[in-house]
Amino acid sequence: MARVKEEADRISEQANSHIENIRRQIEQEKNDWAAEKQKLIEEAKAEGFEQGVALGKAEAMKQYAELIGQANSITEMSRKAVEDKLEDANEEIVELAVALAKKVWQQKSDDKEAFLLLVQQVINEVKEYDDISIYVDPYYYETIFQQKDEIQQLLYKECRLGIYADEKAQKGTCYIETPFGRVDASVDTQLMQLKDKLLTALEAGAAE
């Protein structure tokens, strides 16, 4: 467990460092864009003054308005670029979080209690069905089978429960057959669902 924690801390530090670098880069670009906008405004003022002397105030104001419009366009493009960069950063953060979860799981792959907990969480999604068959890879089969009574208590009272070993399945594989289809409780599938949930949460936050 100590080794797992050290690895998790290391990956977490990498993620935090990566996020901080992105934040610094975005802040620098915002400052650069602000300076560029101010420069354009100053140029517009200067050109407006010179044009006012040579061509008259009306023409000068037109030139001034055009340059101000350019400055505003740069500001809008800057804002959009910052939003895009933050969105990319959020996706990278999600990838790092999922990679961390997978790394920790791989180092705990012999932890049968952790796998049992994962399976039980998925069983909660199908506990109202009246016929359930659980298929597990050979490594974890005995662990799941020994907990059959405990699993049965999670289910609908009259539910028929079967637990089977899938000899061809890779380690960490588990799927549940129900009258309404299959539910995949495998580790990789759960990690992908975690990723989808994190991305959905980020998108919802951005929409707000």
UniProtKB/Swiss-Prot annotation:
Protein name per its UniProtKB record: Probable flagellar assembly protein FliH
Family the entry assigns: Belongs to the FliH family.
Role of this protein: Needed for flagellar regrowth and assembly.
InterPro entries: Flagellar_FliH/T3SS_HrpE (IPR018035), FliH_Bacilli (IPR022524), T3SS_Stator/FliH (IPR051472)
Originating gene: fliH
A Gene Ontology term for the protein's cellular component: cytosol
Protein keywords: Bacterial flagellum biogenesis, Bacterial flagellum protein export, Protein transport, Transport
PANTHER family named among the record's database cross-references: FLAGELLAR ASSEMBLY PROTEIN FLIH, YOP PROTEINS TRANSLOCATION PROTEIN L
Organism: Bacillus subtilis (strain 168)
Pfam families attached to this UniProt entry: FliH
One annotated GO biological process: protein transport
Keyword Heme listed: no
